[in-house]
Curated annotation (Swiss-Prot):
Keywords: Cytoplasm, Hydrolase. The gene is ureB. Belongs to the urease beta subunit family. Pathway: Nitrogen metabolism; urea degradation; CO(2) and NH(3) from urea (urease route): step 1/1. It comes from Streptomyces avermitilis (strain ATCC 31267 / DSM 46492 / JCM 5070 / NBRC 14893 / NCIMB 12804 / NRRL 8165 / MA-4680). Its EC number is 3.5.1.5. This is Urease subunit beta. It catalyses: urea + 2 H2O + H(+) = hydrogencarbonate + 2 NH4(+).
Length: 103
């Protein structure tokens, strides 16, 4: 191995295996693109995005950590969401949850 070398595994990397998946269609009704990161509490995403926020409560995008999904104006996008794990506490963000999801 060479210092700094990256050795890739064969095949795709599995993530969020066995997690309950919620599928939603999201429409960006705003006039500018909106990007949502992998671990952002999706129910609190930009208010310009039109989707079932109640179904998204306590969930995040089912994408690789550190990535994001970009929503262009007027274009519907189907997304998959998985439940937030760990302590399931959502501090700050847009202030709509502000604490424990399961309280």
């Amino acid at each position: 191995m060479i210092p700094g070398e990256i050795l890739f595994a064969d095949g795709p990397v599995a993530y969020n295996e066995g997690r309950e998946v919620t599928r939603l269609t999201v429409l960006n009704a705003a006039d500018r693109p909106v990007q949502v990161g992998s671990h952002y509490h999706f129910a609190e995403a930009n208010p310009g995005l039109d989707f079932d926020r109640a179904a998204a409560r306590g969930k995040r995008l089912n994408v690789a950590a550190g990535t994001a999904v970009r929503f262009e104006p007027g274009i519907p996008v189907d997304v998959e969401l998985v439940p937030l794990a760990g302590a399931r506490v959502v501090p700050g963000l847009r202030g709509e949850t502000g604490g424990a999801l399961d309280a």
